[in-house]
Amino acid sequence: MIPGEYQLKSGDIELCVGRKSITINVANKGDRPVQVGSHYHFAESNPALSFDREQAYGYRLAIAAGLAIRFEPGQTREVSLIPYSGLRRLYGFRGEVMGPLDNKPKQESV
């Protein structure tokens, strides 16, 4: 082995094998591009993005870690989402969860 050498297995690496996923359509209704990272809570993404946020609650993009998807102004695209796993606690982002995902607050009707 050479110091710093990579020894990789042959074949493809499959992401999200066996994970439940959903597919939603997302439209950028804004006038600027919006980029969403791989581990961002999709329901809390930029308000210029139009999609079913209720359906996306507790989900993130089903893409490799460190990647992002860019939505150009006026663009509509289909994305796959997978649920957060582990303790399913979120803090930060836009501050809409700040704790366990499974204790989702009820939406107030107006």
Curated annotation (Swiss-Prot):
Keywords: Cytoplasm, Hydrolase
The protein's annotated pathway: Nitrogen metabolism; urea degradation; CO(2) and NH(3) from urea (urease route): step 1/1
EC number, UniProt record: 3.5.1.5
Name by which UniProt lists this protein: Urease subunit beta
One MF term in the entry's GO annotations: urease activity
Xref: SUPFAM superfamilies: Urease, beta-subunit
Uppermost EC category: hydrolase
Family label: Belongs to the urease beta subunit family.
Gene Ontology CC: one annotated term: urease complex
Keyword Nucleotide-binding: no
Catalytic activity: urea + 2 H2O + H(+) = hydrogencarbonate + 2 NH4(+)
Biological processes per GO annotation: urea catabolic process
